[in-house]
Swiss-Prot record:
<feature type="topological domain" description="Cytoplasmic">
    <location>
        <begin position="412"/>
        <end position="427"/>
    </location>
</feature>
<feature type="transmembrane region" description="Helical">
    <location>
        <begin position="206"/>
        <end position="226"/>
    </location>
</feature>
<feature type="transmembrane region" description="Helical">
    <location>
        <begin position="428"/>
        <end position="448"/>
    </location>
</feature>
<feature type="transmembrane region" description="Helical">
    <location>
        <begin position="292"/>
        <end position="312"/>
    </location>
</feature>
<feature type="transmembrane region" description="Helical">
    <location>
        <begin position="330"/>
        <end position="350"/>
    </location>
</feature>
<feature type="binding site">
    <location>
        <position position="410"/>
    </location>
    <ligand>
        <name>alpha-D-glucose</name>
    </ligand>
</feature>
<feature type="binding site">
    <location>
        <position position="304"/>
    </location>
    <ligand>
        <name>alpha-D-glucose</name>
    </ligand>
</feature>
<keyword id="KW-1133">Transmembrane helix</keyword>
<dbReference type="GO" id="GO:0015149">
    <property type="term" value="F:hexose transmembrane transporter activity"/>
</dbReference>
<feature type="binding site">
    <location>
        <position position="339"/>
    </location>
    <ligand>
        <name>beta-D-glucose</name>
    </ligand>
</feature>
<feature type="topological domain" description="Cytoplasmic">
    <location>
        <begin position="475"/>
        <end position="502"/>
    </location>
</feature>
<feature type="topological domain" description="Extracellular">
    <location>
        <begin position="124"/>
        <end position="132"/>
    </location>
</feature>
<dbReference type="InterPro" id="IPR036259">
    <property type="entry name" value="MFS_trans_sf"/>
</dbReference>
<keyword id="KW-1015">Disulfide bond</keyword>
<feature type="transmembrane region" description="Helical">
    <location>
        <begin position="27"/>
        <end position="47"/>
    </location>
</feature>
<dbReference type="InterPro" id="IPR005829">
    <property type="entry name" value="Sugar_transporter_CS"/>
</dbReference>
<feature type="topological domain" description="Extracellular">
    <location>
        <begin position="48"/>
        <end position="76"/>
    </location>
</feature>
Length: 502
């Protein structure tokens, strides 16, 4: 019996590890990029378990109150410096990705080799602060480069699932950073004057060096195995046959006319936008474009006010208010394991439930976690029940974030903007995200020492605001074509881009 063309196409797709399966050629490219996501998570969390060891080795706090207050301020700067650097990096990322998505990843990996070496040999506050600022700069580049690479290197039906891998590897990096920190032993008090052991003096430096090894692996993969640029970038630069070739790998079939046409349409729209000078500044003067940019920036900024980066970068300090030193790092490790594992469900439900529904569920989870906890702490923060409730609340929050706001935001930011402003608008939204991270993380050390209840009230209140904002203003993007936006009609875009955008 003669097979139909559909059957032949299907069998060929299976033979090539096509798009019907989660594990296929496209996934290999995505994983090579997600090593940068791992570095992102690792760098954000690495100070969580070793910060106090650094304070002791550098002798920032030896018992004098003024000296120790100054030490707390230094610790706050070290925590926030990554996010300050990320603001600059995310602002620069839009320029970098214009030279190639794969190229930007190679720049990032080479950059982190240098940064890892610099951080591991530091001996002074100013040098470690500078190296942490550089780490943040690299992270800022990652926030735009990796999601864009994944979005353009992925089958249309897998964009959501593969997009979640960016967040999954971030959580894995967070987990590994805290796990390696366990080798340092019991979390010390920053005011301790006891000298560190030889192993501890070496180990915290090796922890800073570790991303260098991951970066080398990333360079090897992108240089020798996954050498192609994204099909969108290739087509945009006139390399149509090369674009078609990589699309065949991604889709697992020789028939790639439909995705090629989608890229062609998106590139033509983008070309028309460039001819008509739809810059970010001009877009902000056009109501329809300004609205979608503001929505993306607000959504991105609100993510930080769930409190995620306080838990990721400073959970040890928070848990000190509720636990003995012996259990602090262990609990932080358990928290990062939960964070990592609970990102997996998002891979499967992001395409089933959609982006908006997941965002709403995540905000509701944070509200349910922190609001009762804040009220309970206000009534009696000394009771064992309230302390246990506070610890449980952090886990409920982590679970809620891991399956929703964490992975979905970065997918959404690359689906909500039309192609003519996508690069610059996504970069601006990422920049806003990092500015808000600084606002939240920098005072966290001081606020935790004063009263964790304040943080619980802030995070629950902002999550209520986030829920209302998403419910009333955010639209679904699931299943949308590349380069389109549910917020701006093609007619509206043509009005500003010209008829050539059709």
């Amino acid at each position: 019996m003669k097979k139909s063309s559909k059957e032949i196409s299907s069998s060929q797709s299976l033979k090539n590890g096509g798009s019907d399966h989660f594990f296929n050629t496209s996934l290999m490219y995505v994983l090579a990029a997600c090593l940068a996501s791992f570095i992102f998570g690792y760098q954000v969390s690495v100070l969580n378990t070793i910060k106090n060891f650094i304070v002791i080795e550098f002798g920032w706090c030896t018992g004098n109150k003024v000296e120790c207050d100054d030490s707390t301020l230094k610790s706050s700067f070290l925590l926030a410096s990554v996010f300050i650097g990320a603001v600059v990096g995310s602002g620069f990322s839009g320029y970098l990705v214009q030279h190639g998505r794969r190229f930007s990843l190679l720049v990032i990996y080479n950059f982190f080799i240098l940064v890892s070496i610099l951080t591991s040999i530091t001996h002074h506050f100013h040098t470690i602060l500078f190296s942490r600022l550089l780490s943040g700069f690299g992270i800022g580049l990652i926030t735009v480069s990796v999601p864009m690479y994944i979005s353009e290197m992925t089958h249309k039906d897998k964009k959501g699932a593969y997009g979640v891998l960016h967040q999954l590897f971030i959580t894995f990096g967070i987990f590994v950073a805290v796990l390696l920190g366990m080798a340092m032993g019991e979390a010390p008090d920053a005011k301790s004057v006891d000298a560190l052991g030889e192993f501890q003096k070496i180990w915290w430096r090796l922890m800073f060096f570790f991303p260098c090894l991951i970066s080398i692996l990333g360079i090897v993969l992108l240089t020798f195995f996954y050498k192609e640029e994204t099909p969108y970038y290739l087509f945009e630069n006139g390399k149509i046959e090369e674009s078609k070739k990589i699309l065949k790998k991604i889709y697992g079939t020789d028939n790639v006319d439909e995705p090629l046409k989608a890229i062609k349409d998106a590139v033509e729209q983008n070309e028309a936008a460039k001819k008509n000078s739809i810059s970010l500044m001009r877009a902000m003067q056009i109501p329809s474009y300004r609205n979608v940019i503001l929505l993306g920036c607000i959504l991105s900024g609100l993510q930080q006010f769930t409190g995620i980066n306080v838990l990721v970068s400073n959970s040890n300090e928070l848990y000190k208010e509720f636990l003995s030193n012996k259990l602090i790092t262990t609990l932080s490790v358990i928290m990062t394991v939960v964070n990592f594992l609970m990102t997996f469900p998002a891979i499967y439900i992001v395409e089933k439930l959609g982006r908006k529904t997941l965002l709403l569920c995540g905000c509701a989870g944070v509200i349910c976690a922190f609001l009762p906890t804040a009220i309970a702490n206000q009534i009696d923060s000394t009771s064992a029940f309230v302390k246990n409730l506070s610890i449980a609340a952090t886990f409920v929050m982590i679970i809620s974030f891991a399956v929703s706001y964490g992975p979905v935001l970065w997918i959404y930011l690359h689906e909500m903007f039309p192609s003519e402003i996508k690069d610059s608008a996504a970069s601006l939204a990422s920049l806003v995200n990092w500015v808000c991270a600084i606002i939240v993380v920098f005072p966290s050390d001081i606020i935790i020492k004063k009263s964790p209840t304040i943080l619980f009230f802030i995070f629950s209140g902002m999550s209520i605001l986030s829920f209302l904002f998403i419910f009333f203003f955010i639209k679904e993007t699931k299943g949308g074509e590349i380069g389109t936006s549910p917020y701006i009609t093609m007619e509206e875009r043509q009005k500003h881009m010209g008829k050539s955008a059709v």
